[in-house]
């Protein structure tokens, strides 16, 4: 699918997808393009697109470079998969002849939000670099919202976990905690990747003054968000360690109970084993009260360590 946008009265407006209109486009957003759509861009604009396999490369030389096809940036965008788990999607940005090409394999919240804003928001410079930086700025705003949501969730989780009561809510809190840790790690990766992309853009291009200041402002926003995200990692680790501590304490209580029970019944078992041998020369076997005596001895053997443990405060 090709979404083409041109400038009209300093605003982005969507245009038709035929070749004539594509020549006037300043931004072409390609969402899972078909082979036919790739050929349209190649024949009409002379622009070849990266494959989705190339978007998975993580080395800097494969994500940020410039060649005869233009300036290329591959950047991560935060999203959620079909099961509402945190995920990252790679988007390819290419700027050539004053035109921005974006290639992605799924719908992304940052792109959807920017398209909505562009209906009423005017562009200052009306160039492809401004559109690129506006998309990055929208992405950072989304990441800031994600961090704020994690903060709010961790406040609720901390009340459940630090309460120490291991019930269904405690188990659910542990599951949510692991999800928040995964989300926070993806936010950190996205921030770092965006920082590298903007650094490359500032170094390798002659941005207009307004766009240069905009890029630096986004970099400052990233630097301000990174400590917040790092503190989230620390809080998640603290809550995880606290939860593991409570679980270990509960397990120790259970093991302590079984250890005491086994020690209590060990003397009684010894008595039962002794009289269970049934040798004829055991005088108690022919004693009228031998059986009650053995039972009483077993009870006394079990109660003696129990009373001793209670006095020692071990129970």
Curated annotation (Swiss-Prot):
Location(s) in or outside the cell: Cell inner membrane
Signal peptide start and end residues: none
| Keywords linked to the UniProt accession | Cell inner membrane, Cell membrane, Ion transport, Magnesium, Membrane, Transmembrane, Transmembrane helix, Transport
The reaction(s) catalysed by this protein are: Mg(2+)(in) = Mg(2+)(out)
State the InterPro entries in the record. CorA_cytoplasmic_dom (IPR045861), CorA_MIT (IPR050829), CorA_TM1_TM2 (IPR045863), Mg/Co-transport_prot_CorA (IPR004488), MgTranspt_CorA/ZnTranspt_ZntB (IPR002523)
Motif Probable selectivity filter, residue range(s) on this chain = 276-278
MF (Gene Ontology):
cobalt ion transmembrane transporter activity; magnesium ion transmembrane transporter activity; nickel cation transmembrane transporter activity
**Bilayer topology annotation:** Multi-pass membrane protein
Q: Which residues cross the membrane?
A: 257-277, 289-309
Q: Which GO terms describe its cellular component?
A: plasma membrane
Marked site positions, Essential for ion permeation = 252
Q: Which domain of life is it from?
A: Bacteria
Print the domain comment field: The central ion permeation pathway is formed by the first transmembrane domain from each of the five subunits. Mg(2+) binding strengthens interactions between subunits and leads to the formation of a symmetrical homopentamer surrounding a closed ion permeation pathway. Low Mg(2+) concentrations trigger both a conformation change within each subunit and a loosening of the interactions between subunits. This results in an open ion conduction pathway. In addition, this results in a less symmetrical shape of the whole complex.
Annotated function: Mediates influx of magnesium ions. Alternates between open and closed states. Activated by low cytoplasmic Mg(2+) levels. Inactive when cytoplasmic Mg(2+) levels are high.
Oligomer status and interactors: Homopentamer. In the absence of Mg(2+), interactions between subunits are weakened, and dimers, trimers and tetramers can be observed in vitro.
Protein family per UniProt: Belongs to the CorA metal ion transporter (MIT) (TC 1.A.35) family.
**What's the protein here called?**
Magnesium transport protein CorA
**Organism of this sequence:** Haemophilus influenzae (strain 86-028NP)
């Amino acid at each position: 699918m090709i979404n083409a946008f041109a400038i009209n009265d300093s605003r982005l407006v969507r245009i038709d997808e035929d070749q004539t209109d594509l020549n006037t486009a300043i931004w072409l957003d390609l969402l899972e393009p078909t082979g036919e759509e790739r050929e349209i861009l190649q024949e009409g604009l002379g622009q070849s697109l990266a494959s989705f396999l190339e978007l998975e490369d993580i080395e800097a030389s494969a994500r940020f470079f410039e060649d005869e096809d233009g300036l290329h940036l591959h950047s991560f965008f935060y999203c959620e998969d079909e099961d509402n788990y945190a995920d990252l999607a790679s988007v390819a940005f290419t700027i050539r002849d004053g035109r921005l090409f974006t290639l992605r394999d799924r719908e992304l919240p940052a792109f959807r939000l920017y398209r909505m804003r562009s209906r009423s928001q005017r562009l200052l410079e009306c160039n492809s670099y401004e559109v690129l930086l506006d998309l990055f700025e929208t992405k950072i705003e989304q990441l800031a919202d994600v961090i704020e949501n994690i903060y709010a969730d961790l406040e609720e989780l901390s009340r459940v976990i630090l309460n120490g009561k291991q019930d269904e809510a405690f188990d659910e809190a542990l599951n949510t905690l692991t999800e928040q840790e995964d989300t926070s790690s993806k936010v950190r990766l996205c921030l770092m990747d965006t920082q590298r992309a903007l650094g490359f853009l500032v170094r390798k291009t002659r941005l207009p003054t307004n766009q240069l200041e905009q890029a630096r402002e986004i970099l400052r926003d990233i630097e301000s968000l990174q400590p917040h995200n790092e503190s989230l990692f620390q809080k998640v680790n603290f809550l995880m360690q606290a939860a593991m501590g409570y679980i270990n304490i509960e397990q120790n209580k259970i093991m302590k109970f079984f250890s005491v029970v086994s020690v209590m019944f060990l003397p009684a078992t010894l008595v039962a084993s002794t009289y269970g041998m049934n040798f004829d020369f055991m005088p108690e076997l022919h004693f009228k009260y031998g059986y009650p005596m053995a039972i009483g001895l077993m009870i006394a053997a079990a109660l003696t360590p129990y009373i001793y443990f209670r006095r020692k405060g071990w129970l």
